[in-house]
């Protein structure tokens, strides 16, 4: 599922 990929992307994006 892409949900897991989105979660990882969100986590990396939240690493501002």
Swiss-Prot record:
Transmembrane segments: none annotated. Keywords: Ribonucleoprotein, Ribosomal protein. It comes from the Bacteria. The keyword Isomerase does not apply. One of its GO terms (cellular component) is ribonucleoprotein complex. Involved in the binding of tRNA to the ribosomes. Belongs to the universal ribosomal protein uS10 family. Part of the 30S ribosomal subunit. This is Small ribosomal subunit protein uS10. It comes from Geobacillus stearothermophilus.
